[in-house]
Every structure is written in C-alpha cells, then in structure tokens.
Amino acid sequence: MEVERVQAIASLGQKLDTIPSEFIRSEHEQPGKTTFDGPIPEIPVIDLGDKDGIVGAVAEAAREWGLFQIINHGIPVEVIKELQRVGKEFFELPQEEKEVYAMDMVTMEGYGTKLQKETEGKKAWVDHLFHNIWPESRINYNFWPQNPPDYRKANKEYAKHLLEVMGEILTSLSLGLGLEGHVFKEALGGDAIELLLKINYYPTCPRPDLALGVPAHTDMSAITLLVPNEVPGLQVFKDDHWFDAKYIPNAIIVHIGDQIEILSNGKYKSVLHRTTVNKEKVRMSWPVFCSPPGEWMVGTLPQLVSEDTPAKYKTKKYKDYQYCKLNKLPQ
C-alpha cells in the first residue's frame, strides 16, 4: 500500500495557498488562533559549565517548565553540524530511496509519516525517520540510511557524546530531589537505557496558521534531548498559553518526559508541547528519546512515597506504558 508523504504533498502544493482538509486543525488547535502574542516568558537556559549552579537550575526548570535549553554541554559544534547535515541529505534523496527504509510498525523504526493515533482523523505536517542509536545491542542498521555514506559515522559520534549529557541531566534531576545522583539512571535501567533518534522533517506549508507539525503531546520517554535547525517552531504550553521557544544556536533542548514525572511522583513535570510549521523554510529537528528497556518496570520511587504523599502513578512495564500512550488508552 502506497503511503502519501507530506514532503510530496508539500511539493505538489507549492503554488497553492491551501492545504488538504485533513491537515487543517480545529480552531482550538490552530496556531494562528492559539499562539500567545504578548511578551514571551524566558524558557530557562542552563549553562552546564556552571557546576555549582546546575543542580538547582535543572531541578527548578523541571518543576516549573518541564523544558529547558542547555549550553556549554560539551558536544562539539561540528558533531552537531554533521548529524544535521547527514539527516538533511537523507530527506533530500529521491522518494524511492527513502522508501527503502519504510517504517516497521512492530519496532516503530524506519521512515514514515504517521505515528500516533490522531484524534478527529487529522494529520500532522511532518515526515520522520526513527532508529535506535544506543545500546549497540538494540541497533538495527537496516534502518540507518546508507546514503549519505557518512550517516553512520555522524550518528555514532553524536550518540557517544549525548550519553554523557544524558547522564549529567539524570544525575542533576536525582540530586535536585535530595536523592543520590545515581538513583534516576538506575531506576530507568542503568546502562541498558535506550536512545531512540527521530528526525522530524517539516516541509514548507502554505498555511502554517492552520496546520501543526506535531500536535500537543507529552513525550513518553524519561527525557528527550533535541537539537533543531535554525527555523523556530517548538511551542510550550504553560499558564494556559502556547509560547514560542526561542532558537539558541547549538543549544540542546531538554524535555522532561512521562517516565521522569512518574519516578518523581509528579514533582517534575512532563512538558506539553507541539510544533508549528513555516511558509518559507523547511524545519527539521533531531530529538533523542532516552527511555527504559521495554520490559523494565517503572513506577514512583519508594523514597518519594509516604503516608502523606502516596504514589500517584501505577508501576508497569515500559512497553505497556508505550502501548497505552500510542493507542490513547488510559494508563
């Protein structure tokens, strides 16, 4: 069965001032009507070079926003640029070359268009590529593009650096709750934590006021570490408003995901966010979802539960949580 890719729809509609009806959001979702247009509060920017202030800053941002940007994170600029270059080149390949990597609906890896079950039958203005980048035992190179030829090298190099950043963030989140630094990482599987890369490709859209690249959602991961290209589009929901996230070159955007909210018993917030699209420029982003293995049991940490503060969340296998989330079933 042939699947219609958004990139193909966008190229056909370049001369039009309209988009297919299945991409037009209801009024309560349309970014043209729902984006806050007053003074925008500053999303926290945290300097990982400031070793004295990092724990307090990460914990406060995770409580108040569920999202923050990190600078001086130690990942060389050229490593990020290479990751972005090879990803962009993949999406510029002829369509039939990309379809070789079409999504496997069992593992959720590969090239595709539709992921989550959409309410109201609406579609998101995005194509994507998913594949695991860590641990080695979870990597299936059948989903790693062979073109461009240095795709594998660029992704492996990025993964190596990103593991260190992930460890630093998880340690800070643990310490920020008065726990020992290793607690969160161990509660998520330790060295078995899995890193899943997604490349989002948001083609130019003639009606960015009506469409969304990705509708409002929280990430099911523990944390998500994301680098975007220079085209803004990420929006965060806070205080009943949708706010634009400012683009900071070479910063990494950190999303607190559902598993950290569960472990922390709600002290840290999984951030509700969405993505807008652009009329003139292609937007791309490279989120990496850091998650426990599928069979791993995740629940509120016992250290954070007492008679006065009972656990707010069920303990369950991560794969069962995933299934419910993707199929919009109650947890």
From Swiss-Prot:
- Family matches, as Pfam families: 2OG-FeII_Oxy (PF03171), DIOX_N (PF14226)
InterPro entries from the xrefs? DIOX_N (IPR026992), IPNS-like_FE2OG_OXY (IPR044861), IPNS-like_sf (IPR027443), Oxoglu/Fe-dep_dioxygenase_dom (IPR005123), Plant_2OG-oxidoreductases (IPR050295)
Report the coiled-coil segments: none
- Tell me what reaction this enzyme catalyses: a (2R,3R)-dihydroflavonol + 2-oxoglutarate + O2 = a flavonol + succinate + CO2 + H2O; (2R,3R)-dihydrokaempferol + 2-oxoglutarate + O2 = kaempferol + succinate + CO2 + H2O + H(+); (2R,3R)-dihydroquercetin + 2-oxoglutarate + O2 = quercetin + succinate + CO2 + H2O + H(+); (2R,3R)-dihydromyricetin + 2-oxoglutarate + O2 = myricetin + succinate + CO2 + H2O + H(+)
UniProt keyword Iron present: yes
Q: In which pathway does it act?
A: Flavonoid metabolism
Tell me, what does this protein do in biology? Answer: Catalyzes the formation of flavonols from dihydroflavonols. Can act on dihydrokaempferol to produce kaempferol, on dihydroquercetin to produce quercitin and on dihydromyricetin to produce myricetin.
The entry's protein name is Flavonol synthase 1
Query: Which species is the source of this protein?
Result: Crocosmia x crocosmiiflora
